[in-house]
């Protein structure tokens, strides 16, 4: 589990295919510069969130680590297939402070940035998500975007999906990869765990589910 509070901005330095050059079904190995993330207590097999996706550390050295990413994960996430900056967070420990909200690191789907611009001292971010994700979004609810715990500012259901907006304070823009966003960019989305369980409980108690 994670909190959605980014601990460091690292960088994917190398993307190495795990199979032969002609095998398109294999995954890749990512070599990630830690960007100042403290790796002293990270063991092989531990989890680190990279752009909101939970990955298992399979190699570690001074200032960097490596993870293997399956082709399936690559097809359903953004920002993991080429070198670039990435948000990093180590897995939550029992005694850690929960500064954001409970985040599993399992990406539910991709969203598309429709608007990203300064508004006063902050930035307004608008994202178009699928209806399947949109049904879990609520005003002042939580959502994870590229591994960052954020608060939903508005929700607008549209024929082509659900557009929601977020207000980003200057600190969040400065210390995460969200500062690189622009219209058309794809982002990793994870819905709030509580919203997921509430939806399941409501569907399980419906007359159709009971019959």
Which residue stretches match the model-derived regions?
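Conserved loop->alpha-helix
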Residues: 1-211
């Amino acid at each position: 589990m994670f909190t959605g509070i980014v601990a460091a901005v690292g960088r994917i330095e190398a993307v190495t295919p795990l199979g032969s050059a002609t095998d398109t079904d294999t995954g890749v190995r990512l070599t990630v510069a830690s960007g100042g993330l403290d790796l002293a207590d990270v063991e092989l097999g531990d989890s680190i969130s990279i752009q909101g996706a939970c990955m298992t550390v399979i190699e570690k050295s001074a200032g960097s680590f490596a993870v293997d990413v399956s082709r399936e994960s690559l097809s359903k996430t953004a920002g993991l297939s080429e070198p670039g900056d990435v948000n990093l967070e180590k897995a939550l420990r029992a005694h850690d402070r929960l500064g954001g909200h409970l985040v599993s690191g399992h990406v539910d789907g991709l969203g598309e940035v429709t608007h990203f611009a300064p508004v006063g001292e902050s930035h307004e971010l608008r994202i178009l998500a699928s209806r399947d994700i949109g049904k879990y979004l609520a005003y002042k609810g939580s959502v994870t975007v590229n591994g960052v715990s954020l608060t939903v500012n508005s929700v607008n259901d549209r024929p082509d999906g659900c557009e929601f907006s977020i207000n980003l304070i200057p600190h969040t823009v400065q210390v995460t990869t969200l500062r690189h966003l622009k219209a058309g960019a794809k982002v990793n989305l994870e819905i709030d765990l509580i919203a997921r369980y509430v939806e399941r409980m409501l569907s399980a108690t419906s007359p159709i589910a009971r019959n």
